[in-house]
């Protein structure tokens, strides 16, 4: 079941077509790690996360951020089945990685901020509302294994 209107879907897919996954992904994950430093504990293998500049310049942060946004691209193709789309990732993050599901919500909010910064006037209140709905849906789907 989807709670996305045709307008939501159009706003999400239209903006997504303009997103540079590598750049936006690295920036989003980097900002999450800077603003919410406790999230760094999940990335011990990434090397130096000792300062904002170390985090933002870390190639492993950039690569994983791109991977996260690539996964988000799959969600955008499957807005009507976010829970199904993220079933395996929810299981991995819950059972194996023990990630607090609140972190998914935080990451989504950071992504919305990054999109707003990079897309200026195109990032209207309506587009923001649609993206906020989508990242909330993704966070819920990723957290579904926890419930």
Swiss-Prot record:
List the Pfam families: Globin (PF00042)
Sorted keywords for this record are: Acetylation, Heme, Iron, Metal-binding, Oxygen transport, Phosphoprotein, S-nitrosylation, Transport
Modification Phosphoserine, positions = 45, 51, 53, 140, 144
- Oligomeric and partner information: Heterotetramer of two alpha chains and two gamma chains in fetal hemoglobin (Hb F).
Gene3D superfamilies under this entry?
Answer: Globins (1.10.490.10)
| Record-annotated Globin domain positions | 3-147
State one molecular function term (GO): oxygen carrier activity
This protein's encoding gene = HBG2
What protein name is recorded for this chain?
Answer: Hemoglobin subunit gamma-2
Source organism of this protein record: Sapajus apella
Q: Tissue expression, per UniProt? A: Red blood cells.
Q: Name one GO cellular component term.
A: hemoglobin complex
Q: Could you tell me which residues carry S-nitrosocysteine?
A: 94
What's an example Gene Ontology biological process for this entry?
hydrogen peroxide catabolic process
């Amino acid at each position: 079941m989807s709670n996305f209107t045709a307008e939501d879907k159009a706003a999400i897919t239209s903006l997504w077509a303009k997103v540079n996954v590598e750049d936006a992904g690295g920036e989003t994950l980097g900002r999450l790690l800077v603003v919410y430093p406790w999230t760094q504990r999940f990335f011990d293998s990434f090397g130096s996360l000792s300062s904002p500049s170390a985090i933002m310049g870390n190639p492993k942060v950039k690569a994983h951020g791109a991977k996260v946004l690539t996964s988000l691209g799959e969600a955008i193709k499957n807005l009507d089945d976010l829970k199904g789309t993220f079933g395996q990732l929810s299981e991995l993050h819950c059972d194996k990685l023990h990630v607090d599901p609140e972190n998914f919500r935080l990451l989504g909010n950071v992504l919305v901020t990054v999109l707003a910064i990079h897309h200026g006037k195109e990032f209207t209140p309506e587009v923001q509302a649609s993206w906020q709905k989508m990242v909330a849906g993704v966070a819920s789907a990723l957290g579904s294994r926890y419930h």
